[in-house]
Amino acid sequence: MRELKIFSGRANHDLAEKLCRHLHLKPARITLGQFPDGENYCKLDEDVRGRDVFLVQPTCPPVNDNLIELLTMIDCCKRASAERITAVIPYFGYARQDRKDEGRVPITAKLVANLITRAGADRVLTMDLHAAQIQGFFDVPVDHLYAAPVINDHFVSRRFAGDEVVVVSPDEGSIKRALGHTKRLGGNLAIVDKRRTNALEVRQNTIIGGPVEGKVALMFDDMISTAGSICGAARLVHEAGAKEIHIACTHGVLCGPAIERLREAPIDSITVTDTIPVTGEKLLPNLVQLSVAPLLAEAIKRIHHDQSISELFRER
C-alpha cells in the first residue's frame, strides 16, 4: 500500500500535529514562507512520489493568504508526482458566498472549489460547511464531516441534557441543526424570530416555542463570525428568563467586534472547536475549545485504506 504523508500549512499547525499523533505519524517536512515581495514560497522537504498525500489547511483569516498557500501546496505535490492528494480543509472560507443573493455578484464558493480542483486536489475532506450544497461545487469527491457529536458529548459530560435544557435556534436557518441537537440532548426547541433589516443590521423580535424561562439555554451555530446574531439572540433569551446560556459552534472565526460583543453578552460559556486557531485576546475566560482531531484522523485513516467513512457523517 502507498505510504501516507500528512503536510500542514501555516494556518493551523497545532491541529495537524494533533491528528498526526492520533495516527502515530510525524508531520511530513515542508518549507513554507514568502519572498520579499510577498509571494508565497513552498518546497517539499521529502519525497512524495507515489504517496498518498493529505494537506491540512483551513482557509480561515487571513483567508486569501491561507487559500493561496493551500493552492501552492497542492500544485507542489502534483508536480512532485504524488499519487493522490486530499485537501483537508477543516474550515472552508468563502462558504457564505454560495449563491447570488443580488444582481452582479459572484458565486465565490464555486470559484474557490474550481481553483482547488484545477490545482490538482483529488479529494476534499472538510467539516460543517456553511452551506451543504457546496459539496456539489467540486468535481472531485468531498467528504463532509460534522462536529455535532463532539459538541454534544461535551454538553452531556457537563450534564446539560434532559428536561432542564432548551435548545435555541438563533435564527430560522439553524432550525435543522437545533433539531439534531435536541435529539441527542433532549429538552424543548425554541426559535429566535430574527428579522434582518439589511446585510449588516439584524433586529431580533420574538421567541417561538420553548419555554425558556428557568431553563438552561443551549444555542448552536456552524460558525461565530462577528457574533452579532448569536449575542442578540442570547440577550433575548436572557430577557425571557433563561437561568443559564451556553453557546457553541464548530468554527470560531471571531472577527471584528466579536470578542467585545461576547464579553458584554449574558453568555455563561462559549464552546468552539479547533478547526480554526483561537489565540491571544480571543481566549476568553469562559471559552472552551474542543478538538476535532480524532474525528479527522479517523477519516484520514479510512480514506487512506479505501474504507467507508459514511458512519462518520453523523450530524448529531
Curated annotation (Swiss-Prot):
UniProt cofactor(s): Mg(2+)
GO CC annotation terms, alphabetical: cytoplasm; ribose phosphate diphosphokinase complex
InterPro entries xref list: PRib_PP_synth_CS, Pribosyltran_N, PRibTrfase_dom, PRTase-like, Rib-P_diPkinase, Rib-P_diPkinase_bac
Pathway info: Metabolic intermediate biosynthesis; 5-phospho-alpha-D-ribose 1-diphosphate biosynthesis; 5-phospho-alpha-D-ribose 1-diphosphate from D-ribose 5-phosphate (route I): step 1/1
Binding site for Mg(2+) 2: D171
SMART domains, alphabetized: Pribosyltran_N
Residues of the signal peptide: none
Protein residues bound to ATP: D37, G38, E39, R96, Q97
Active site: K194
GO molecular function, one term: kinase activity
Protein transport listed as a keyword: no
Entry similarity comment: Belongs to the ribose-phosphate pyrophosphokinase family. Class I subfamily.
Name of the protein: Ribose-phosphate pyrophosphokinase
Classification lineage: Bacteria, Pseudomonadati, Planctomycetota, Planctomycetia, Pirellulales
Gene (UniProt): prs
